[in-house]
Amino acid sequence: MMYLHKAPHRAWWPSPEKFAEFYEKEFPEPATLFDDYSGRGTAAKTAEMNILTHMQYMHDSKVRPETIKVMGKVEPEIVYVRGDGSLMYPTAQGFYGPFGRANNEQKKKYDVTLDKISQDFKENWPNMNDKEKMQWKFQRYMQDYLATISSVDDNVGRVLNSLDAKKIADNTIVVYTSDQGFYLGEH
C-alpha cells in the first residue's frame, strides 16, 4: 500500500485549526534572513528565494485580495519574469483558488484568522520599513509552512497508531521519503 501526502509546498493551507494555532506563534529569525547575496555567484543572486520580494501577499501571506485593493499599490510590488521575458503579476486567484476548496464550515474558521492577518497588514504594512516587512512576511511564511508540516505529522501519527491498533505494525515496513523541503529563511 502507498500512502502519500501532498508535499508541503505552495500553497500552504493547513487545516483551519492549525492555521489559527500557528498564527499565534512567533518563530526565531535565521542569521541569514537579510542576506543580500553580494559577492555570490549569479545563481544565488537571481534565485527567487527572497521572502520580501518573492513571496506574494495574497497567495503566500494570506492577505485578502479586498485588503490589497483598498490599500492600492503595496510596496514592494511583486513581479515575476517568465522564461520568455514577459512579466507575471500575482492575482487574486492565488488566494481564492486554494481558499475556494474549503467547505463552508472550514471557510468560517479560516475567516477568523484571515481577518486578523488582513487587519494587521492594512494597519501596519504602510508604516513598516523593509526590514520590518521582511520580518512580517517571514513570520507569516513560518506560521503557514510549519502548520502544514504539523498537519502532515499528525496524519502520519494516525497511520502509525492504526497499524498498532490493528496489531500489524510489526509486520509492516514504513518508508519515509521527501524532497529537501523549503528553506526556512536560512541558507
Provide a role label for each language-model segment:
Residues 1:
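Glycine-rich ThDP/TPP pyrophosphate-binding loop and its adjacent helix/strand module
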Residues 4-170, 175-187:
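Active-site-proximal cap/lid insertion segments
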